[in-house]
């Protein structure tokens, strides 16, 4: 589902929450991110500050968690000590290959992973919301520097 401010407002209202200007601004940032870009809470905070849209870091953390629980954002562990987020686009499933040395991240598609996720979910009676695979390794550049 592609979220607009109106659809986000409707879903938030349905769950007993409201669409605040801060939530709308955070949604807008993620909608305008270039493909393949992921933001941490701190990245988002700095981005908003640079645009003269100061939102407290605690509000950002709460909003990111809420939007991830709603399925609007994907929460990612990208080999760092904090989470990153990206817009969840169900029709654009992709996975991540991450270098544990330099944190270089490559996105890739795999229908096999999605099929396994769908089959396993169905077998266990789950409704599949998202299926993501994260592979951790050492990139060729970092391998050369280890030798």
Swiss-Prot record:
Compartments (UniProt record): Cytoplasm
Pfam short name (any one): FUR
Single GO molecular function: DNA-binding transcription factor activity
Region DNA-binding, annotated ranges: 1-90
Record's keyword annotation contains Flavoprotein: no
Residues forming coiled coils: none
Gene Ontology biological process: negative regulation of DNA-templated transcription; regulation of secondary metabolite biosynthetic process
GO cellular component: cytoplasm
Keywords (A to Z) from UniProt: Cytoplasm, DNA-binding, Iron, Metal-binding, Repressor, Transcription, Transcription regulation, Zinc
Family: Belongs to the Fur family.
Protein name: Ferric uptake regulation protein
Native organism: Synechococcus elongatus (strain ATCC 33912 / PCC 7942 / FACHB-805) (Anacystis nidulans R2)
Gene coding for it: fur
């Amino acid at each position: 589902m592609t979220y607009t401010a109106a659809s986000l407002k409707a879903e938030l209202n349905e769950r007993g929450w409201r669409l605040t200007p801060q939530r709308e601004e955070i949604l807008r940032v993620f909608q305008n991110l270039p493909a393949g870009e992921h933001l941490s809470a701190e990245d988002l905070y700095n981005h908003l500050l640079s645009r003269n849209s100061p939102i407290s870091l605690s509000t950002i953390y709460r909003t990111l968690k809420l939007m991830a629980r709603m399925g609007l954002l994907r929460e990612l562990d990208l080999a760092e000590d904090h989470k990153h987020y990206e817009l969840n686009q169900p029709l654009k499933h992709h996975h991540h290959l991450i270098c544990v040395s330099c944190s270089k991240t490559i996105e890739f598609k795999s229908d096999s992973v999605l099929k396994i996720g769908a089959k396993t979910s169905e077998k266990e009676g789950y409704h599949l919301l998202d299926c993501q695979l994260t592979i951790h390794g050492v990139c060729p550049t970092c391998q050369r520097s280890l030798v």
